[in-house]
Swiss-Prot record:
Propeptide section residues: 23-48
Protein name as catalogued: Mu-conotoxin Lt5d
Similarity comment: Belongs to the conotoxin T superfamily.
Processing after translation: Contains 2 disulfide bonds that can be either 'C1-C3, C2-C4' or 'C1-C4, C2-C3', since these disulfide connectivities have been observed for conotoxins with cysteine framework V (for examples, see AC P0DQQ7 and AC P81755).
Purpose: Mu-conotoxins block voltage-gated sodium channels (Nav). This toxin inhibits tetrodotoxin(TTX)-sensitive sodium channels, but does not affect TTX-resistant sodium channels. Reduces the amplitude of currents without changing the activation and inactivation kinetics of currents.
Any matching Pfam family: Chi-conotoxin
Other known facts: Negative results: does not have the ability to interact with the G-protein coupled somatostatin type 3 receptor (SSTR3).
Example of a GO MF term: sodium channel inhibitor activity
Entry keyword set: Cleavage on pair of basic residues, Disulfide bond, Ion channel impairing toxin, Neurotoxin, Secreted, Signal, Toxin, Voltage-gated sodium channel impairing toxin
């Protein structure tokens, strides 16, 4: 009988998995891969512009 309270506490600590998505997706949701691609693109543009100078006009992307 002493183990019963411990067993109940352990059951309460186990997170239950939802059977359906807790938050439905909307048209505003952006996949994580898209955010990752946008971050990579922004960093690439930053690195390209960092080395840009009047002597290297061909390296400058508008």
């Amino acid at each position: 009988m002493r183990c019963l309270p411990v067993f109940i506490i352990l059951l309460l600590l186990i997170p239950s998995a939802p059977s359906v998505d807790a938050q439905p997706t909307t048209k505003d949701d952006v996949p994580l891969a898209s955010l990752h691609d946008n971050a990579k693109r922004a960093l690439q543009m930053f690195w390209n512009k960092r080395d840009c100078c009047p002597a290297k006009l061909l390296c400058c992307n508008p």
